[in-house]
Curated annotation (Swiss-Prot):
Expressed in neutrophils and neutrophil-differentiated HL-60 cells. Expression in neutrophils increases with differentiation. Component of the SNARE complex composed of STX4, SNAP23 and VAMP7 that interacts with SYT7 during lysosomal exocytosis. Found in a complex with VAMP8 and SNAP23. Detected in a complex with SNAP23 and STXBP4. Interacts with VAMP2. Interacts with SNAP23 and SNAPIN. Interacts with LLGL1. Interacts (via C-terminus) with CENPF. Interacts with DOC2B. Interacts with STXBP6. Interacts with STXBP3; excludes interaction with DOC2B and SNAP25. Interacts with STXBP4; excludes interaction with VAMP2. Interacts with STXBP5L. CDD domains: SNARE_syntaxin4, SynN. SUPFAM superfamilies: t-snare proteins (SSF47661). The lineage of its organism: Eukaryota, Metazoa, Chordata, Craniata, Vertebrata. GO terms for cellular component: basolateral plasma membrane; cell surface; cytosol; dendritic spine; endomembrane system; endosome; extracellular exosome; extracellular space. Its main location: membrane. One of its GO terms (molecular function) is SNAP receptor activity. Residues 1-12 have a biased composition (Basic and acidic residues). It is linked to Deafness, autosomal recessive, 123: A form of non-syndromic deafness characterized by bilateral, severe to profound sensorineural hearing loss with onset in the first decade of life. Sensorineural hearing loss results from damage to the neural receptors of the inner ear, the nerve pathways to the brain, or the area of the brain that receives sound information. Residues 154-297 are annotated as: Interaction with CENPF. The gene is STX4. This is Syntaxin-4. Belongs to the syntaxin family. Residues 200-262 form the t-SNARE coiled-coil homology domain.
Length: 297
């Protein structure tokens, strides 16, 4: 009969390696040795996560402020300044996250050399998932600002109709919006129309807001285009990563349940042993008593 012990051992080694890979995908920050490269890596990951959460909060604040300004015919300068400050903070946080992601990105040479390393794949996983979260948040911010721009344009269009300036077509309106200066935009409106001072002020304010908004959108686009492209190329890989993380988390959870069950079974086995020992002791005592009584009798 052929000795297959070596093959079985190889199978066990392969299974152990798969288990290690699964666990590596869901390694929790703080489990690495203090001062080790992994601990430093996870410290950076925690920092990025915290910054992404902070960015998300700022995006929510921006959305609320935009809704408030849209509901105000003539928003105060302080409101517009607060909105611009939020945009600046979002851009600054975006730059910070981009640099932080760059710092944990596995170098190509290192990744190629250690492609099958569990540690390398874990780092690529963390970088990929964080990058995707970042890009999704920025896409949400850009979409939100684009929608805000359209609502401002609609407010201008509505004001023009109210003031009998309805002859301005959508194309002409876009051309005037692209003029780059509020004064030029307003003078173009005044050429052939009679506009009230209040309506004129609102139109001018909306136009200035649109200009600032467009600059913000362009700057965000310039900052994050390369990262969005990279994440799009890695989209399938990131989806696999998320699937692996979920399955790995289930795997670890099942493992914890198995350990818990094993401990409970172990406790039950110990209790059974104690009960058996007690029963045996009682039986021995009874036999001794019976034998003693018989001998005396």
């Amino acid at each position: 009969m052929r000795d297959r012990t070596h093959e079985l051992r190889q199978g066990d080694d392969s299974s152990d390696e798969e288990d290690k890979e699964r666990v590596a995908l869901v390694v929790h920050p703080g489990t690495a040795r203090l001062g080790s490269p992994d601990e430093e890596f996870f410290h950076k990951v925690r920092t990025i996560r915290q910054t992404i959460v902070k960015l998300g909060n700022k995006v929510q604040e921006l959305e609320k402020q935009q809704v408030t300004i849209l509901a105000t015919p003539l928003p105060e300068e302080s409101m517009k300044q607060e909105l611009q400050n939020l945009r600046d903070e979002i851009k600054q946080l975006g730059r910070e996250i981009r640099l932080q992601l760059k710092a944990i990105e596995p170098q190509k040479e290192e990744a190629d050399e250690n492609y099958n390393s569990v540690n390398t794949r874990m780092r690529k996983t963390q970088h990929g998932v964080l990058s995707q979260q970042f890009v999704e948040l920025i896409n949400k911010c850009n979409s939100m600002q684009s929608e805000y721009r359209e609502k401002n344009v609609e407010r201008i269009r509505r004001q023009l109709k109210i003031t009998n300036a309805g002859m301005v077509s959508d194309e002409e309106l876009e051309q005037m919006l692209d003029s780059g200066q509020s004064e030029v935009f307003v003078s173009n409106i005044l050429k052939d129309t009679q506009v009230t001072r209040q309506a004129l002020n609102e139109i001018s304010a909306r136009h200035s807001e649109i200009q600032q908004l467009e600059r913000s959108i362009r700057e965000l686009h310039d900052i994050f285009t390369f990262l969005a492209t990279e994440v799009e190329m890695q989209g399938e890989m990131i989806n696999r990563i998320e699937k692996n993380i979920l399955s790995s988390a289930d795997y670890v959870e099942r493992g914890q349940e198995h350990v818990k069950t094993a401990l409970e079974n172990q406790k039950k086995a110990r209790k059974k042993k104690v009960l058996i020992a007690i029963c045996v002791s009682i039986t021995v005592v009874l036999l001794a008593v019976i034998i003693g009584v018989t001998v005396v009798g």
